[in-house]
Amino acid sequence: MGDLELLLPGEAEVLVRGLRSFQLREMGSEGWNKQHESLEKLNMQAILDATISQAEPIQELLINHGKIPTLVEELIAVEMWKQKVFPVLCRLEDFKPQNTFPIYMVVHHEASIINLLETVFFHKEVCESADDKVLDLVDYCHRKLILLVARKGGGDLSEEEQFQDSTPMQELQKQAEMMEFEISLKALSVLRYITDCVDSLSLSTLNRMLRTHNLPCLLVELLEHSPWSRRVGGKLQHFESGRWQTVAPSEQQKLNKLDGQVWIALYNLLLSPEARARYCLTSFAKGQLLKLQAFLTDTLLDQLPNLADLKGFLAHLSLAETQPPKKDLVLEQIPEIWDRLERENKGKWQAIAKHQLQHVFSLSEKDLRQQAQRWAETYRLDVLEAVAPERPRCGYCNAEASKRCSRCQNVWYCCRECQVKHWEKHGKTCVLAAQGDRAK
């Protein structure tokens, strides 16, 4: 990795060993922020290792120190905070923070964790090390897939239109909504990696995927809706690398990554002997699955030849008798993280929000400067540029950018005009970041 090494092996191990679970009321606190910074560093190192095909010590450290279950618990905890506490904060009339970035870091925490899990779950041993928490992760991914299926058409407003005349908290809510889409897409990838391990998953996990959630039918709905594709002005666009990109006519028959993840997950769930033995092919399931035949074109089979086996399975299914729903009496594990957190915090959402308002998110100028300094140290620009899949985007209009804000060095712009228009929103964070840099 040479000059681009972010963490030395000893440093990475210290960060991994220190990972722990936090209570919901602790989110955004000093200790929580330090762990968030650690996760971001581990995230960048894991991506950097994978990008330049180096040995991948981050997932090994997470496995060896038993931290995958901790990451799953933190993921679900921040998901619950966003659903239960964040809306209360947004409704508090006496909460008008001068800077929303500390809250943004909590909102962004879910994206940080799911991104790290997406990077490391590519390796089957990571899934195995999740132990019984893989049940909770399956439930989490199912919730995100439901959001994707329910998502309306992809006619998003431009960032400029979305944030026009918004208060800082309203803008933060809109950013959280945009972030939720990307989080859900990463959850789809994590779920696909879990299905790669279908032959070694517990019966409880298989039953959860196939009977409780009926994931094969849900995946068929995802293929039908294709929420990561849209048409704008007659042009096909796919959501890739964090933004909507126009697909050239010559590339439109090419399988995109997210469709590929769905097909591989379906292949794993329908053709694995272990999964087939647990899946009940009811008349509803048969009707849903046979919809796949229309998608299995020669062009698709050329790109994913293994799907020929799936095509054969569907041909056999079309002639097979359906089964009534099975009502076996089975003792099995159930996910516990969401229910436990909800039980522990029931009736306390308002109190948690007010506690965080007073003790976590109402920072002094000095505290904000210190945080800005830590953020600047965490997000190493040379590393971010090395792992970025493409050129930076303009912070105002999202066009390809070549100029960086000279004061804070954190935000890119395509032209001077966009920088001037964005200053009203960017200014305070920019000044704090610049002051933090000078304080080093």
From Swiss-Prot:
- Major location (coarse): cytoplasm
One molecular function GO term is: molecular adaptor activity
Cite the PROSITE patterns for this sequence.
Answer: ZF_MYND_1, ZF_MYND_2
Q: Which GO terms describe its cellular component?
A: apical plasma membrane; centriolar satellite; cytoplasm; dynein axonemal particle
Q: What happens when the gene is disrupted?
A: Mice neonates exhibit growth retardation dying within 1 month after birth. Show head deformation and situs invertus (heart apex, stomach, liver or spleen). Display lung lobular structures deterioration and collapsed alveolar spaces. Show mucosal congestion in paranasal cavities. Show loss of ciliary motility and axonemal outer and inner dynein arm (IDA and ODA, respectively) components without disruption of ciliogenesis.
Keywords (A to Z) from UniProt: Cell membrane, Cytoplasm, Cytoskeleton, Membrane, Metal-binding, Zinc, Zinc-finger
The organism named in the record is Mus musculus (Mouse)
Query: Where found in the cell?
Result: Cytoplasm; Cytoplasm, Cytoskeleton, Microtubule organizing center, Centrosome, Centriolar satellite; Apical cell membrane; Dynein axonemal particle
Q: Which tissues and organs express this gene's product?
A: Expressed in the testis. Expressed in the tracheal epithelium. Restricted to regions containing motile cilia.
Protein name (Swiss-Prot/TrEMBL): Zinc finger MYND domain-containing protein 10
According to its UniProt entry, what is the function of this protein? Answer: Plays a role in axonemal structure organization and motility. Involved in axonemal pre-assembly of inner and outer dynein arms (IDA and ODA, respectively) for proper axoneme building for cilia motility. May act by indirectly regulating transcription of dynein proteins.
| Record-stated family | Belongs to the ZMYND10 family.
List ligand-binding residues for Zn(2+) 2: 405, 408, 426, 430
